[in-house]
């Protein structure tokens, strides 16, 4: 699905350098590290000793994340067109890799083919027949609050509908970051459900980030300087609420953002939604 993603630099609310739980310094201006694999369709860079960021070249830096524990690894999202993605990640980690999705849009599921099973939230099953029509493996479900034990590293699944009905965000609380897919937009948020649902998810993640001291979220279209911060999530919550309460008037858009005809644009983020689906 074509998306109009405006890769404006996000204003990060954290300090110029932030240490992870192991004390590794990470440059907040660009968390993408050294290149460990590159071909015509994807480039993988190392974030820390056990985490890698992949960027596809088809739809505005569509991003995938390889997250490794002592016993196994998960691959979060699969890009748009990445042939033999299983063989690519096998060059990066020797651990068995399980494919998991933040949501089922075409620019996040394109490389799932070689994986024998794929995990996602059941809320996105209505779009799977279109976006994953050729997938022959098993589809399994991830539930809100589910904890994935990778061996010495745990990843928690939190339900964040809004962009799609089944969007989820993955959190590594020990490292103080998460992987949010398109739930908060990569600076250009497309709400395919409604604003009430998006506001609910933003408020929930705002509280989660405060409670667990989450520094930032790696988005689904990461360009190196557009991390999602607590402030960004709070701004999205407030902008949705203001539209719903009549305090902020949306403007008409040209419909190029996923066919959506309304938008609000402020604080470095654009929220696109459809008047046909209703705001509530």
Model-based region annotation:
Residues 100-103, 121, 160, 164, ...:
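Ser/Thr-glycine-rich phosphate-binding loops at phosphate-binding pockets of nucleotides
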Residues 38-91, 169-182:
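Conserved beta-strand hairpin/beta-sheet module of binuclear metal-dependent hydrolase folds
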Residues 73, 80-81, 156-159, 165-243:
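Metallo-beta-lactamase
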Residues 4-14:
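Sec-dependent N-terminal signal peptides
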Residues 47-53, 145, 154-156:
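Short, hydrophobic/aromatic-rich segments at coil-to-beta transitions
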Residues 81-151, 242-245:
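Active-site HxH/HxHxD metal-binding segment of metal-dependent hydrolases
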Residues 22-46, 123-130:
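Short, basic/low-complexity N-terminal boundary segments at the transition from targeting/disordered tails
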Residues 15, 19-35, 203, 207-280:
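Accessory terminal helices/loops
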């Amino acid at each position: 699905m074509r998306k109009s993603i405006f890769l404006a630099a996000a204003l990060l609310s954290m300090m110029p350098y932030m240490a992870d739980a192991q004390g590794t310094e990470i440059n907040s201006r660009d968390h993408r590290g050294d290149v460990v694999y590159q071909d015509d369709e994807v480039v993988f860079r190392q974030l820390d000793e056990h985490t890698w960021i992949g960027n596809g070249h088809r739809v505005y830096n569509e991003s995938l994340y390889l997250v490794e524990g002592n016993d196994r690894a998960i691959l979060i999202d699969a890009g748009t067109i990445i042939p033999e993605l299983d063989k690519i990640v096998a060059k990066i980690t020797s651990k068995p890799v399980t494919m998991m999705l933040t949501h089922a849009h075409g620019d996040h599921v394109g490389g799932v083919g070689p994986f024998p099973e794929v995990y996602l939230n059941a809320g996105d099953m209505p779009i799977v027949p279109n976006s994953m029509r050729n997938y022959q493996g098993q589809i399994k479900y991830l539930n809100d609050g589910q904890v994935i034990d990778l061996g010495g590293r745990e990843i928690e699944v939190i339900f964040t509908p809004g962009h799609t009905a089944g969007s989820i965000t993955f959190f590594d609380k020990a490292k103080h970051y998460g992987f949010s897919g398109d739930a908060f937009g990569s600076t250009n948020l497309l709400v395919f459900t409604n604003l009430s649902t998006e506001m609910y998810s933003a408020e929930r993640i705002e509280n989660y980030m405060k409670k667990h001291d989450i520094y930032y979220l790696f988005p689904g279209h990461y360009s190196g300087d557009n991390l999602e911060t607590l402030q960004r999530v709070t701004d999205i919550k407030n902008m949705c609420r203001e539209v719903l309460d009549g305090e902020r008037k949306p403007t008409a858009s040209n419909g190029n953002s996923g066919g959506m005809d309304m938008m609000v644009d402020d604080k470095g983020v654009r929220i696109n939604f459809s008047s046909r689906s209703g705001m509530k």
